[in-house]
A protein has these predicted regions:
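Non-catalytic accessory/interaction domains
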Residues: 1-6, 11-17, 24-28, 36-250
Length: 250
């Protein structure tokens, strides 16, 4: 039915990402067109993209080619400079970097109005951030529901806003923030020390998945703590605080 290039673990996530980018109605309509047109014939992957493009009016082939025809996936960073929201994509690396200038068609899936739904260039600049913020509620987030195949890197005041409301987010969003910050630390884009403010906001977390993810980070941080130092004392205090809530709850 589908091109072999997407029949593996990554494939289901990409199709879910595509479905959300197009919308359920257009996705269903495109599948209907595809099955009716090819019910008695062989197909290739582009036949499906053509049908979905016909139904949605969007360039589905270009969207999917950016994800299927090149390796890796992007990290999308967001920062505010001189009241301008700057959104930038680059390839995400853990370990040795070999920048190739790759770009993806990235569904931003923001929780704010006034944000484009897609990032197609390396950099997108949106002026008058203060007005944009005033017109929306809550911290700006991308890849809501974690349906797209990229990592978000919030910087400066954007990260501060997310941390301020982290404890009140749903479990999926909390887990997403924790996992993204951990991956950014593993890639060297942020320090492991910058994970501590995230953990401190989740000391009364009861979700098993979130608690497990944070516990894994805490265990890994122990490798960077020198014995007999103030850092070790602070680390042990955080460890006790984090575990105490769930110990008493149980």
């Amino acid at each position: 039915l589908f091109d072999p290039a997407i029949v593996y673990a990554k494939g289901s996530r990409l199709m879910h990402m595509l479905r959300r980018w197009l919308g359920d109605d257009a996705f269903r309509k495109g599948l209907k067109i595809y099955f009716e047109k090819h019910q008695y014939s062989n197909t290739i992957g582009r036949d499906l993209w053509d049908a979905l493009g016909q139904a949605s009016g969007r360039d589905v082939a270009a969207f999917m080619d950016s994800w299927l025809e090149q390796p890796g996936y992007p990290v999308v960073s967001a920062s505010v400079e001189n009241d301008t929201l700057i959104i930038r994509q680059e390839q995400f690396f853990i370990g040795e970097r070999e920048e190739k200038g790759r770009k993806w068609v990235v569904p931003l899936n923001s929780n704010w109005t006034g944000i484009p739904d897609t990032l197609e260039t390396e950099v997108l600049e949106i002026p008058n951030y203060s007005a944009l913020k005033a017109a929306n509620s809550g911290a700006l987030r991308f890849n809501t529901e974690n349906t797209a195949h990229y990592i978000s890197d919030y910087r400066g005041e954007l990260l501060e806003d997310i941390l301020a409301e982290l404890a009140s987010l749903d479990s999926t969003s909390k887990l997403q923030v924790v996992q993204e910050r951990r991956l950014l630390a593993e890639s060297g884009q942020i320090s492991y020390a910058s994970l501590l403010p995230v953990i401190e906001k989740l000391t009364q977390e009861s979700s098993y998945l979130v608690v497990s993810a944070v516990s894994s980070i805490l265990q890994g941080l122990s490798l960077f703590v020198d014995e007999g130092t103030e850092v070790e004392a602070a680390y042990k205090k955080l460890l006790v605080t984090f575990n105490q809530f769930n110990f008493e709850r149980l």
